[in-house]
Amino acid sequence: MATGAVPASFTALKSRDHGLGFAKSMDFVRVSDLQRVKFGRKKVSVITNSNPGSEIAELQPASQGSPLLVPRQKYCESIHKTVRRKTRTVMVGNVAIGSEHPIKIQTMTTTDTKDVAATVEQVMRIADTGADIVRITVQGKREADACYEIKNSLVQQNYNIPLVADIHFAPSVAMRVAECFDKIRVNPGNFADRRAQFETLEYTEDDYQKELEHIEQIFSPLVEKCKKYGRAMRIGTNHGSLSDRIMSYYGDSPRGMVESAFEFARICRKLDYHNFVFSMKASNPVVMVQAYRLLVAEMYVQGWDYPLHLGVTEAGEGEDGRMKSAIGIGTLLQDGLGDTIRVSLTEPPEEEIDPCRRLANLGTRAAKLQQGVAPFEEKHRHYFDFQRRTGQLPMQKEVLFQLFWDLYGELFCYFIQRLLN
């Protein structure tokens, strides 16, 4: 039986058995082969590290037994009041994103990108409604070719709103559209990798390093092109589209989302490219908030100051969609995090602008007034320990009703009869 105990957060796990993953940051994973008659399984146990290094951000319960996780390290300027996090400025066309500028509002078109006329018309409606940035999905080369026509048509009609290309699975398409659009959104989970298929569950140290080199080889030309043309970029991790490599090491977790984005960010920094923002989107607001906070905690550790794009994926429609977005985006804005936001609704994109603006105004006002809470003594509930509460019952006094009935029986019956009548 082969066993090994290794830090689960290391980029390359050194163990004789590499079937590791699904552990929290800086916990240790022990893997054992269990010999079965018909099939083999691996027993995985997590050994908590009681003294994790301060150089690695990690999540911990907000209080003893609490299901809410927050970073152990600093993840915002203040946990008592809203103070906006200081970031560098990233230029998206003629629009500046960063802590020195107002929170920018953006949305995404819903038309077929190949339908140039319909897309141009929708972008103009969005711009007239008050959006600062518009994102357009670009699936293939025909859509990329249409992007040139879309950009030219908008310029001819005096619309200079920055356009963002949403790219998945197609590095060559990103290379082409970077020549005309102002910003490229890449998803680290599927730009160079495929979305997790779980075809490969075990990665050796060499396998992991080879995939990182493969990512750098594919991603670097786009970074160089964005530098050449002065384009911005969003490294946008999606909770639902992590790669096999990330899933096998970190699982479907906020830590995996952060590590996926950092792999691409390190390549950008290596090539001296800094005109990018981060996003950590999930359809679950709790996961989304935990991922963003962990990302910021990690950036504080690294000394990075890149802006944040906030959003909840597939929030829905009507009140439900607005409430989900308000919970996720609003929580982070109260933390002082977020420099551009999108409220994702299954409605016409123009309908996203008003709730987006309301949230941006609330976040701006909270930061301006540095809204907070008065100091108070925290008393945490113990979720797993049972203890009977003590207290004093109300005073009880014995009354002799028989005497009342004997003395005033006739009068009592008279009043009862009157009530019944």
Q: In which residue ranges do the predicted regions lie?
A:
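Glycine-rich, proline-tolerant flexible connector loops at the mouths of alpha/beta enzymes
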Residues: 110-115, 128-154, 188-210, 276-285
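Hydrophobic or amphipathic alpha-helical targeting/insertion segments
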Residues: 160-230, 234
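Catalytic alpha/beta core domains of metabolic enzymes, predominantly
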Residues: 202-219, 223, 245-405
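Active-site mouth loops of central-metabolism enzymes
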Residues: 83-85, 99-118, 137-139, 161-170, ...
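Hydrophobic faces of well-ordered beta-strands that scaffold small-molecule active sites
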Residues: 103-109, 132-136, 161-167, 184-186, ...
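Alpha-helix-loop-beta-strand connector modules within alpha/beta enzyme cores
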Residues: 141-165, 213-230, 263, 295-304
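N-terminal chloroplast transit peptides
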Residues: 1-40
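Glycine-rich phosphate-binding active-site loops on the catalytic face of alpha/beta enzymes
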Residues: 130-132, 180-197, 335-350
